[in-house]
Amino acid sequence: MNKIILLLLLIAFISCSDNNENISGNTGLFNQTTFFDGLSRDYILYVPSSYDENENTPIVFNLHGGSGTAEEQMNYVSDMRNLSDSEKFILIYPQASSDSNGIPIWNLGGVNSKATDVDDVGYISHLIDKISEFYSVDRDRIYVTGFSNGGYLSFELACKLSSEIAAFASVAGHMFIDTYNDCSPTHPTPFLSINGTEDNYDGIAGYYLPIDNSNNYWIEYNKTDLVPEIIEIDDANTTDGSSVQYYSWKNGTNGVEIDHYKVLGGDHSWPSLNTNSDKGKSNGDIDSNRIIWEFFSRFDINGLR
């Protein structure tokens, strides 16, 4: 009987353990599992070949949309691996837990959440600490971006994990009303948004704010210029049915700024120079991945670098 109990305990211990043995400072692509808050959570880790253990390295979290997966986000929506190689940052694609209907979705808390018993803010914080155990991480340069529901969580993290998040970006995402009501950032926070004017998810009453209101929160909080610089982006792809305007509110506290790319005629999608996307009518005039990284790279937790 004692042997059976011991065996069961051993099985339970193994099932609750992280599979860290294959990372431990190594470079490459890793499908990982970690145990947090009573749940087994998956994520994809990409460490560039340019990683140097003697240098502190930034982290970029890239969050998939509702009903999506980490693998889909990496392979079909926002593959940042080439950027990670050339720009020397660690890339993490976390996987959301599933709601009662089996749909992967990030928990934003509040009365409108579909997964109220899951602590996704704590999960991202856990991943920061976990990866920092095995790699030389620049804790002043932790960035987060996401698509749709992943964009919503990026707002949540900027509000509730502010001490860790240096800057954030949202694509086809908005600020959840509960996030807005409970937001308590602790430092000036640079923010970039990319949204289509034909996105049917923009500002659904009772759930989340229109993107203009979401931007305005951070414009006011960061004390930037109230009048933006506006630039018409070259309509390089004339067959995608859309064009882009760039807005930038500059001169915020500690040099931070708020940038917004308005995709005229664009809908719920992640703009890319490769417009073969299954995520809406994708604009082909801008490279969202590069735009986001170049924005992030200018800032750390203290503001403009």
Which role fits each region the language model picked out?
Residues 4-13:
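Sec-dependent N-terminal signal peptides
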Residues 61-63, 171, 263:
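Alpha/beta-hydrolase
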